[in-house]
């Protein structure tokens, strides 16, 4: 470990102080001068005067500015032998010298050495000097940390990271799956590098670009790519770094940030998680947060106020665009809003190709198959997936990852860590029937997603799992698809009831019932897919703030609410009856599949369908199932 001079100084100062006081106390001038004459016995001053009156004192040596005397005395009490005795003298005893002279006692005074006085003075001044020096050192460090030397108490200085030419190691070629957003930002970068091609036709540089999208979709990665490509000064800061414990700090930091940005224009200012400071004003109980609102007001003024900010492009990222203040979103501040959504199949494939560049894979590994099997995965999820697969490959001591590691990693990312396999018991058989109930319905219903695999290996909180893979990216879902999913979700409970009886139905279907109820209620209240008609009965005016939402209530009558509950119950009941009917009609193949599942613990989708085909016809679907 390399030690800096500051670290060495920090450790050496206490050692020096302790050593100095140790040396002064035990090796100082007092020990040198008096130590050779020090006596083992002591005597009070009054007793010393008695000895002097009786003529027993022969010699007196004075030390320490006449505060200490070494007395040579002889007498009956001392065994008639000369004894050296130490006597502490009072501060003021003018008659002592006179008495000693009258008694003809040898008297000698030993003044302290000049070096002793110097060391005494240094000893008295050392601690205060070290204290003052330490405080000055800490104060200087505090100033440097908050904005540079000589800027004491600079709480209002911006904490933005400034890079004249940002070297993030990320360029646009490293960003995949968000082609539309890349085009927007490539245009911004071109505007910064070659503004004349735009100004020639009267175009103005955009003042702000807002990145909106779910977590993990690559918003911050895009900002890093812009910083790596733009070759202009780049400021980056988080929205949470503006407001702190002191009043007025947020607005002051905004002013300081934009002052620095204007001094270095043209430049880019990136504000990550802008929702921390850009929330709507006047919300919440009590009217909101005054300090945050002052910061937001200052930000609004700096972005498009009286003075303007020519040459400064503000790029912000958030996954909560619905709570941002409307004044912040208007043109002139954020001219463009770029949506960065979860990637589709092509986007996932491009992202996997980027992250697979530095991974060793077997030739049989198909990135297209992985992309098909991971609908809904964000860019961060896909990066984590391949990293987990690489870790698992190293753990298994393989030279390259295979589809087996990738399949296990997908299961881990989606459902959690693998648990201990179940032992053969009635509970294991019940779980097997539950999972096969889901899978058989998913295979036989035309509009249901195809089965990928069925397993009894526990993961997370689930004792068993049935995996379905959508045949394509479904941005639009039909009524028949929703109903098929409801029937499939009820398949596990239906199998429990048909096989083991109503008394043996377990709590294992609790999560299924939550999903079923949610889907059925959305069919009625959001999508207009019930007998109530094409009505949206969900309130769209609710805000994610306690203040405005406290007074909100339902926008329909009690009669309509009762009808909604009736329609939800009717949809679920019809789907449950259909699920039980499918279970009863396919009891033979279900029993065979359960026995095979208990034996193997995992059945892949192709094998599952091949067995079902021996007993009944299966609707044609698109299958993207990995082969091992």
Swiss-Prot record:
User: Which intervals lie on the Stromal side per UniProt?
Assistant: 1-7, 140-628
Binding sites annotated in the UniProt record for Zn(2+): 434, 438, 512
> Where in or outside the cell?
Plastid, Chloroplast thylakoid membrane
The entry's active site is: 435
Q: Which residues bind ATP?
A: 213-220
Required cofactor(s): Zn(2+)
* Cofactor binding annotation: Binds 1 zinc ion per subunit.
Q: Which GO terms describe its molecular function?
A: ATP binding; ATP hydrolysis activity; ATP-dependent peptidase activity; metalloendopeptidase activity; zinc ion binding
Describe the protein's quaternary organization and the partners it interacts with: Homohexamer.
PANTHER family noted in UniProt: ATP-DEPENDENT ZINC METALLOPROTEASE FTSH 2, CHLOROPLASTIC, METALLOPROTEASE M41 FTSH
Family, according to the entry, reads as follows: In the central section; belongs to the AAA ATPase family.
What does the function comment of this entry state?
Acts as a processive, ATP-dependent zinc metallopeptidase.
Protein name as catalogued:
ATP-dependent zinc metalloprotease FtsH
This chain is encoded by the gene named ftsH
């Amino acid at each position: 470990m390399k030690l800096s001079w500051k670290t060495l100084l920090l450790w050496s100062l206490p050692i020096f102080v302790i050593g100095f006081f140790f040396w002064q106390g035990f090796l100082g001038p007092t020990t040198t001068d008096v130590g050779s004459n020090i006596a083992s016995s002591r005597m009070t001053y009054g007793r010393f005067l008695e000895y002097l009156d009786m003529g027993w004192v022969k010699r007196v040596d004075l030390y320490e500015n006449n505060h200490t005397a070494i007395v040579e005395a002889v007498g009956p009490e001392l065994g008639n032998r000369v004894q050296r005795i130490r006597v502490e003298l009072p501060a003021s005893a003018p008659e002592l010298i006179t008495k000693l002279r009258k008694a003809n006692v040898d008297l000698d005074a030993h003044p302290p050495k000049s070096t002793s006085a110097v060391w005494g003075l240094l000893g008295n001044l050392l601690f205060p000097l070290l204290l003052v020096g330490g405080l000055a050192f800490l104060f200087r460090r505090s100033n440097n940390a908050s904005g540079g030397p000589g800027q004491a108490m600079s709480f209002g200085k911006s904490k933005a990271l400034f890079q004249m030419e940002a070297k993030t190691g990320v360029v646009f070629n490293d960003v995949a799956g968000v082609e539309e957003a890349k085009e927007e930002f490539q245009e911004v970068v071109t505007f910064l590098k070659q503004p004349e091609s735009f100004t020639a036709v009267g175009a103005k540089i955009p003042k702000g670009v807002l990145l909106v999208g779910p977590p993990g979709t690559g918003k911050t990665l895009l900002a890093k790519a812009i910083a790596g490509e733009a070759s202009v000064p780049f400021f980056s800061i988080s929205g949470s770094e503006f407001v702190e414990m002191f009043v007025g700090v947020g607005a002051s930091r905004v002013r300081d940030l934009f002052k620095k940005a204007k001094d270095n224009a043209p430049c880019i200012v990136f504000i990550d998680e802008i929702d921390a400071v850009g929330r709507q004003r006047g919300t919440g109980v009590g009217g909101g947060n005054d300090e945050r609102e002052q910061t937001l007001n200052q930000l609004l003024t700096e972005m498009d106020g009286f003075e303007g900010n020519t040459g400064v492009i503000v790029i912000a990222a958030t996954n909560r665009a619905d709570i941002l203040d409307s004044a912040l979103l208007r043109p002139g501040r954020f001219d463009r809003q770029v949506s960065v959504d979860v990637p589709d199949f092509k986007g996932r494939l491009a992202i996997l190709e980027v992250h697979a560049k530095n991974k060793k894979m077997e030739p049989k590994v198909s990135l297209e198959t992985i992309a098909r099997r991971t609908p809904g995965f964000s860019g961060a999820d896909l990066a984590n997936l391949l990293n987990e697969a690489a870790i698992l490959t190293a753990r298994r001591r393989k030279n390259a990852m295979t589809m087996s590691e990738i399949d296990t990693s997908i299961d881990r990312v989606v459902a959690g860590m693998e648990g201990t396999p179940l032992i053969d018991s009635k509970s294991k058989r019940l779980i097997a029937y539950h999972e096969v109930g889901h899978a058989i319905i998913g295979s036989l219903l035309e509009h249901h997603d195809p089965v990928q695999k069925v397993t009894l290996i526990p993961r997370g909180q689930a004792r068993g799992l049935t995996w379905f893979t959508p045949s394509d990216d479904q941005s639009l879902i039909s009524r028949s698809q929703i109903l098929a999913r409801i029937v499939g979700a009820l398949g596990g409970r239906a199998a429990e009831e048909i096989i083991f009886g109503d008394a043996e139905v377990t709590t294992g279907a609790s999560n299924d019932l939550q999903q079923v109820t949610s889907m059925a209620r959305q069919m009625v209240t959001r999508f207009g897919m019930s007998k109530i008609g094409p009505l949206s009965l969900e309130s769209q005016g609710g805000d994610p703030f306690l203040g405005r939402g406290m007074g909100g209530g339902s926008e329909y009558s009690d009669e309509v609410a009762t009808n909604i509950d009736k329609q939800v119950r009717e949809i679920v009941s019809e789907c449950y009856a259909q699920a039980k009917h499918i279970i009863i009609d396919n009891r033979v193949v279900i029993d065979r599949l359960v026995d095979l599942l208990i034996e193997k613990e995992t059945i892949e989708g192709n094998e599952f369908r091949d067995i079902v085909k021996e007993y009944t016809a299966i609707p044609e679907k698109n299958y993207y199932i990995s082969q091992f």
